[in-house]
Regions:
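Conserved lysine of the Walker
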Residues: 18
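Post-Walker A helix-loop "phosphate-sensing" segment adjacent to the P-loop in P-loop NTPases
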Residues: 26-35
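Post-Walker A alpha-helix
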Residues: 21-22
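Conserved phosphate-donor/acceptor-positioning beta-strand/loop module used by diverse small-molecule
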Residues: 98-103, 112-136, 168-170
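ATP-dependent small-molecule kinase phosphotransfer cores
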Residues: 37-98, 105-108
């Protein structure tokens, strides 16, 4: 019997390195599909449409929202982001594990609709480290940097509401922690109820 895949939520403040950690996870954990989010923000250097994001106009985004295409959607820093249902549930039914790299508010929206989601929060080692990473991007004004840091503090305070917290002190070690969480969840009773029910002929 083919088991359903997991829905995995990966969150963390901007600059925590969650994207880098996720890329490292995908190098060794092959049963993982990354849900490509829809956004109205402009592409950053090196980003490719339909690979990093589905880039849409505000009008296109609102049309998708009106059609009920999103599992969740949020406005962050003046830009809209959304997770397409089609990017998630078709793959889960095929046995693939799907990861959503989304912010805290979006994560709680998904958990409210899909309580079995595995939620993982990526933390920096310190606020000083986080500030250094953000400043190192060279793309933030001093005012924008302070806004990001205040937002990050608020997000980190929500980390205790997640199922798991990992600290990104070393990318490889942090990725290994994420993989260990996924593997443990794959063996959990909540994921294997259908399998046990089939094995026993529906006697439970």
């Amino acid at each position: 019997m083919k088991k359903k895949g997991l829905l995995i939520i990966l969150s963390g403040p901007s600059g925590a390195g969650k994207g880098t950690v996720l890329n490292e996870v995908r190098k060794t954990y092959k049963n993982l599909e990354v849900s490509v989010s829809v956004t109205t923000r402009a592409p950053r250097a090196g980003e490719v449409n339909d690979v990093n994001y589905h880039f849409k106009t505000i009008e296109e985004f609102k049309e998708l929202a009106h059609d009920g295409a999103f599992l969740e959607s949020e406005c962050v820093y003046g830009n809209y982001y959304g997770t397409l249902k089609s990017e998630v549930f078709d793959k889960i039914q095929k046995g693939l594990d799907v990861v959503l790299e989304i912010d805290v508010k979006g994560a709680f929206n998904v958990i409210g609709k899909y309580p079995d989601a595995v939620s993982i929060f990526v933390c920096p080692t310190s606020m000083e480290e986080l500030k250094g990473r953000l400043a190192g991007r060279g793309s933030e004004t001093a005012e924008a940097l302070e806004l990001r840091l205040r937002s990050a503090m608020g997000e980190i305070k929500q980390a205790t509401k997640y199922g798991y917290v990992v600290v990104n002190d070393d990318v490889k070690e942090c990725a290994d922690d994420v993989i260990a969480i996924i593997k443990a969840e794959k063996c959990s009773t909540k994921i294997n109820k259908d399998f046990i029910n089939t094995l026993t002929g529906g006697s439970i």
